[in-house]
A protein has these predicted regions:
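Short glycine-/acidic-enriched loop or helix-start segments at secondary-structure transitions
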Residues: 3-7, 119-120, 155-157, 216
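Short, glycine-rich nucleotide/cofactor-binding loops
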Residues: 113-125
Length: 235
């Protein structure tokens, strides 16, 4: 879970078995705006601290978690007391999945792969994950280029429709952020807030989408080919 630093452990309880009120609280603007809420960050991460407390309050006593590779093969298993097992796997996962970023880049190309590239809600995870790294991968004013067909449009679920409505109905990115900070939002719509934060500092190009008008309505840039996307980013 990107907000928690690493998934697993306490997340089995919260967010896994949490009610909507707790999910709305932990996914709200105050948590997502906090500079400690970053991928791979545990220390000083308020989201991690909140769901760890939730797991403690319901007396989570035992977990069995795994670390997978890109082909879903098991690399490491840990079981036992939640904090000890979780921390063991986090330390191992860091050696597998974390890559030092020597500096910020003008352009980053990345995708989420099938089946997540089938709708814009899921495809937008790629730029947000890179943006919410401890050091954002792309400099302010730079570009994320994301290949995604988005044949399902924004997505058909309630959260996916809330995401699209929030993105498309806002006059601009800044007003979307201001409205969310002032009024909050229901679960699922946090992705619109996350993407507004991304788009406040960078631009996102979606390549090969079957719904280019939907991409434009969501404050992102459609491109037919990777060559076109690179040309747009180079202008």
């Amino acid at each position: 879970h990107q907000y928690a630093g690493y998934s697993g452990g306490r997340k089995t309880v919260a967010v896994g078995a949490a009610g909507e009120a707790l999910i709305a609280h932990t996914h709200g603007p105050a948590f997502i705006d906090h500079p400690g809420t970053r991928l791979g960050r545990i220390a000083g991460n308020p989201f991690h601290e909140a769901i760890t407390e939730a797991a403690w309050r319901v007396r989570l006593r035992f977990i069995l978690n795994i670390v997978l590779d890109d082909d879903k093969r098991i690399l490491r298993v840990a079981a036992g007391e939640p904090d000890m097992a979780f921390n063991e796997l986090v330390n191992f996962a860091r050696s597998v999945y974390e890559v030092p970023i020597p500096h910020q880049y003008d352009i980053a190309i990345g995708g989420v792969g099938y089946p997540k590239d089938s709708n814009l809600y899921q495809a937008s995870r790629a730029p947000s994950y890179l943006f919410f790294a401890p050091t954002p991968v792309v400099r302010p004013g730079g570009f994320f280029i994301i290949p995604a067909r988005c044949e399902e449009g924004a997505g058909v679920g309630a959260g996916e429709q809330r995401f699209f409505n929030a993105m498309s109905q806002a006059a601009d990115v800044q007003s979307s952020l201001e409205d969310a900070r002032r009024n909050g939002y229901p679960p699922g719509q946090q992705r619109a807030f996350v993407m507004a934060k991304v788009l406040e500092q960078t631009q996102v190009i979606i390549v090969g989408s079957e719904c280019p008008d939907l991409v434009t309505a969501s404050k992102m840039i459609p491109a037919k080919t990777m060559a076109e996307a690179l040309e747009l980013a180079a202008q």
